[in-house]
């Protein structure tokens, strides 16, 4: 794994002769050079996320330039983001063309499907100098009529004026909404904040506590479903109106305020970091169990 947004990475790509391709997941722009958050991220306030579109665009442009110069295939993994950022996906959003792109069930309107797209020289099934030497691609679920129909309908709707209008001012709209929610949380002195990459949001905690994970249950009492894993992502539909969002913000603040009032944001003063204490407790419990056995 090479570091993102790093001159050293570009140097490696320029000088090594054994690199065939570079795979990029554009979602990493929300937290470059950090693994996907796990449940452990709920135990401390060390988690950070910040999306800088201009900086990540410059990085992708530099990466594209090096890949072109060295004959390296640039691949975008858009299974998660799909067409959330722009009608043309991350390629259109960042203004950088990949050689190959992967998509998932977004293209199938929610039906299970995997799609690989790319330029002709990488997608053709034979060499021009050996046309009979064909690369077969087979699968028992290939070209399923229902899935193909759903994909065609999705692409038609994606190209319609109605859907195209949803993308106008998308970043400005969702950045303003994230700022609005953070302001409401700050007004209530709640140790919770959000960071966003357009309509993909992540929940952050300002104070370390072994009970931060309980926010998901308080949100559920307000009718909001936060993933039970440590990712804490909120994925919004692009057609959310301002009225829809204000209702979500009201419920989010109400849930966090209830959790605070019930005392679950409390952190023990003058003690070792929560994560370190939990590791000790876990090891102690395992050792005790082994002695009993």
Where are the model-predicted features located?
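Conserved N-terminal phosphate-binding loop of PLP-dependent enzymes in the Aspartate aminotransferase
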Residues: 1-293
């Amino acid at each position: 794994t090479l570091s993102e947004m790093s001159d050293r990475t570009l140097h490696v790509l320029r000088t090594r002769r054994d690199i065939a391709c570079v795979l990029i997941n554009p979602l990493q722009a929300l937290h470059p050079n950090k693994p996907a958050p796990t449940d452990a991220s709920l135990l401390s306030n060390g988690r950070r996320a910040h999306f800088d579109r201009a900086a990540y665009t410059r990085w992708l442009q530099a990466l594209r330039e090096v890949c072109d110069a060295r004959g390296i295939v640039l691949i975008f993994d858009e299974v998660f983001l799909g067409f959330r950022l722009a009608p043309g996906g991350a390629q259109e959003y960042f203004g950088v063309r990949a050689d190959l792109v992967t998509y998932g069930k977004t293209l199938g309107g929610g039906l299970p499907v995997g799609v690989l797209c790319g330029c002709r020289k990488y997608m053709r099934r034979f060499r021009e100098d050996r046309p009979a030497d064909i690369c077969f691609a087979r699968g028992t679920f290939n070209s399923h009529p229902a899935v193909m129909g759903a994909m065609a309908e999705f692409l038609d709707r994606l190209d319609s004026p109605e859907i195209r209008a949803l993308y106008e001012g998308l970043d400005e709209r969702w950045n303003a909404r994230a700022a609005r929610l953070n302001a409401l949380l700050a007004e209530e002195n709640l140790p919770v904040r959000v960071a966003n990459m357009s309509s993909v949001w992540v929940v952050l905690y300002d104070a370390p506590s072994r009970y931060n994970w309980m926010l998901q249950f308080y949100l559920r009492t307000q009718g909001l479903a936060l993933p039970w894993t440590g990712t804490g992502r909120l994925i919004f539909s692009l057609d959310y109106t301002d009225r829809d969002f204000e209702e979500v913000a009201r419920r989010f603040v109400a849930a966090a305020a209830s959790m605070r009032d019930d005392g679950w944001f409390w952190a023990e003063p003058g003690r070792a970091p929560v994560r370190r204490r939990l590791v000790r407790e876990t090891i102690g419990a395992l050792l005790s169990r082994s002695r009993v056995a």
